Amino acid sequence: MTKHQFKLSDPRLLSRIGYQFKQPELLQLALTHRSVSHKYNYERLEFLGDSLLGMIIANYLYHAYPHENEGRLTRMRATLVRQEALGKIATDLQLSRCLILSTGELKSGGHHRESILADTVEAIIGAIYLDSSDLNLLKDIVLKWYTPYLDHIEPTDQLKDPKSRLQEYLQARKKPLPVYEVVDIQGDAPHQHFKVECLVDGLSKIHGEGSSRRFAEQAAAAEILKLLEQ
């Protein structure tokens, strides 16, 4: 039995996901990073899963918060589907030990990279849908993953993204706005990894990383907010 076959047949993994695949090759595809194969990888499943996740979360929020306006519902959805939230879901599902990566990607810490983990969660969502053809079943599975986070989310301004919150924090105190600068880009488009430096008056430079400049800037802003709010 190969390592990948063991992962796919591991009842603990399937139990954490909450679904038994009829076509286990779909799960294997959902766990396979582009570094292993340019053709056989999770990217198409991720594309499908991203749309399905957005719809499932939007539908949940629409019914759970009947009196909230479109703006707040949009911010709540963004909070629940962003990379950071998906990274937490991946940690709950213990996906890092199950990723199928190239040796180089593994050595560089790819199995702990939040962007890869988030992409994998979306790919698994796409795989479950293709395997089951059952949107209601998929909805139940995804919302079960999200239960710890749905129980605590509130339609408040704190649901704004870190860059918006940091800007408002500084504006309220009449301080200069943050300056963001890309200091490193690895890989080729559209599969690049960005490192951004954020400078806020009175603080040391803080770095953030992500699969896009926007994600990297958000990560840096989140770290600065942690320092400012201590």
Curated annotation (Swiss-Prot):
EC class: hydrolase
Keyword rRNA-binding: yes
Gene Ontology biological process: mRNA processing; rRNA processing; tRNA processing
EC number: 3.1.26.3
Residues forming coiled coils: none
Pfam families associated with the record: dsrm (PF00035), Ribonucleas_3_3 (PF14622)
Active-site residues from the entry: 50, 122
Localization per record: Cytoplasm
Cofactor: Mg(2+)
Domain RNase III, residue spans: 10-133
Record: residues binding Mg(2+): 46, 119, 122
Annotated GO CC locations: cytoplasm
InterPro entries assigned to the protein according to its UniProt record, in alphabetical order: dsRBD_dom, RNase_III, RNase_III_dom, RNase_III_sf
Keyword field contains Magnesium: yes
Gene Ontology molecular function terms on file: metal ion binding; ribonuclease III activity; rRNA binding
Domain DRBM: 161-230
Main subcellular localisation: cytoplasm
The reaction(s) this protein catalyses: Endonucleolytic cleavage to 5'-phosphomonoester
UniProt entry keywords in alphabetical sequence: Cytoplasm, Endonuclease, Hydrolase, Magnesium, Metal-binding, mRNA processing, Nuclease, RNA-binding, rRNA processing, rRNA-binding, tRNA processing
Subunit composition and interactions: Homodimer.
Entry similarity comment: Belongs to the ribonuclease III family.
Known function: Digests double-stranded RNA. Involved in the processing of primary rRNA transcript to yield the immediate precursors to the large and small rRNAs (23S and 16S). Processes some mRNAs, and tRNAs when they are encoded in the rRNA operon. Processes pre-crRNA and tracrRNA of type II CRISPR loci if present in the organism.
Cited NCBIfam families: RNaseIII
Protein's UniProt name: Ribonuclease 3
Source organism of the structure: Acinetobacter baumannii (strain ATCC 17978 / DSM 105126 / CIP 53.77 / LMG 1025 / NCDC KC755 / 5377)
Name of the encoding gene: rnc
